[in-house]
Design a protein with these regions (language model features):
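Short amphipathic alpha-helical interaction segments
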Residues: 47-64
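Short intrinsically disordered terminal tails
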Residues: 1, 94-96
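Short, cationic-aromatic polyanion-contact patches
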Residues: 72-94
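Short acidic, hydrophobic short linear motifs in intrinsically disordered regions
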Residues: 30-42
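Alpha-helical hairpin
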Residues: 12-13, 49, 84
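Residues at alpha-helix boundaries and short interhelical turns
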Residues: 28, 45-48
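A short, conserved structural fragment
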Residues: 62-72
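Short alpha-helical segments that sit at the start of domains
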Residues: 1-27, 31
């Protein structure tokens, strides 16, 4: 290993995980609820997903520490609000 060079770790994601992460980052400034992604996104590919698929992939992204979640009130229900972590915000990982 060369001195002064930091190797950026790589994370392999599925197409749907990349899509959700991209929409969350670009359209929602890094934070949104699952139903909010479906309702307010302009991405046609994302709109083809079900809420169950979005939730499942968000949980996998959370397991990989790429998103975090916090319980908040959304339209009268308590749901997870998903936010990108600093790894994504500061591009500390390479997404494959």
């Amino acid at each position: 290993m060369k001195r002064g060079i930091i190797e950026i770790p790589e994370v392999k994601l599925s197409y749907k995980q990349k899509l959700i992460l991209e929409v969350l980052t670009d359209e929602f400034h890094g934070a949104a609820f699952g139903p909010e992604l479906l309702k307010e996104s302009d991405n046609d590919e994302l709109k083809k997903l079900t809420i169950n698929e979005i939730t499942w992939h968000m949980l996998r992204l959370r397991d990989a520490a790429l998103v975090s979640s916090e319980k908040k009130n959304y339209e009268g229900r308590v749901l997870n609000c998903y936010s990108i972590t600093d790894y994504i915000k500061y591009e500390a990982v390479k997404i494959k």
